[in-house]
Swiss-Prot record:
It catalyses: peroxynitrite = nitrate. Keywords: Heme, Iron, Isomerase, Metal-binding. GO terms for molecular function: heme binding; metal ion binding; peroxynitrite isomerase activity. Heme-binding protein able to scavenge peroxynitrite and to protect free L-tyrosine against peroxynitrite-mediated nitration, by acting as a peroxynitrite isomerase that converts peroxynitrite to nitrate. Therefore, this protein likely plays a role in peroxynitrite sensing and in the detoxification of reactive nitrogen and oxygen species (RNS and ROS, respectively). Is able to bind nitric oxide (NO) in vitro, but may act as a sensor of peroxynitrite levels in vivo. Pfam families: THAP4_heme-bd. InterPro entries: Calycin, Nb(III)_bact/plant, Nitrobindin, THAP4-like_heme-bd. Homodimer. The lineage of its organism: Bacteria, Bacillati, Actinomycetota, Actinomycetes, Micrococcales. Binds 1 heme b group per subunit, that coordinates a highly solvent-exposed Fe(III) atom. This is Peroxynitrite isomerase. Disulfide bonds: none annotated. Signal peptide: none annotated.
């Protein structure tokens, strides 16, 4: 059973099953040139909110070294229902809202439900290696399907052109899979993991 925290903005209810801290393991397997890189890793994922209609997201992964855990990769970003921003939303930048805050009740959020019975979502992620991704997709029950709508790379970033991600709640664990198009290759399997709720 998914518990909805008191004070959660109504727009976040479809994503509320993600809230909290998750820890577990995963594996990356991807061809780099003539070699296939295969590595197991530990992972800590956090979804939180600060009263605004988006989830704060961070993921940190490590590999086991001879002297203990060694930092591997990290990413951070924001998850929200996909809708048009209104005068009731802050921004751009630090500009305050000029109207009433939208979608504050369950009935108002229901108007955002799509024809498939889910809710459209967008996810903005930033990687410290010079890559930013904008994903679009949908959340339906306890499953999220995402595909990149845009990828932005700095001049020094590695070749990376697109991705898909799948998240699902299975037996109270969060399972995920991430396919990428990178290093001159088409979209293919890249990494997956299983994390358990720890906080």
């Amino acid at each position: 059973m998914i518990e909805i925290p008191t004070g959660l903005p109504a727009e976040l209810v479809p994503l509320s099953w993600l809230l909290g801290v998750w820890e577990g393991t995963g594996v990356v397997e991807y061809a780099v040139g003539d070699d296939v890189v295969r590595r197991e890793f530990g992972q800590r994922i956090s979804f939180s909110h600060d009263g605004l209609p988006h989830l704060n997201y961070s993921s940190y992964a490590w590999v086991e070294g001879d002297d203990g855990p060694v930092p591997f990769v990290t990413e951070t970003g924001y998850w929200r229902l996909r809708r048009r921003v209104t005068d009731g939303d802050p921004g751009p930048a630090m500009l305050p809202p000029t109207g009433e805050r939208p979608f504050t009740t369950a009935d108002e959020v229901e108007t955002l439900r799509n024809a498939d019975g889910g809710f459209d979502v967008e996810v903005a992620l930033v990687h410290p290696g010079g890559v930013s991704e904008l994903y679009v997709g949908q959340v339906k029950s306890a499953r999220i399907d995402l595909a990149t709508d845009a990828v932005l790379r700095t001049e020094g970033a590695k070749a990376y052109t697109g991705a898909t991600r799948l998240y699902g709640l299975v037996e109270r664990d969060l399972l995920w899979a991430w396919d990428i198009a990178a290093l001159g290759q088409p979209l293919r399997t890249h990494a997956s993991g299983r994390v358990s709720h720890v906080d």
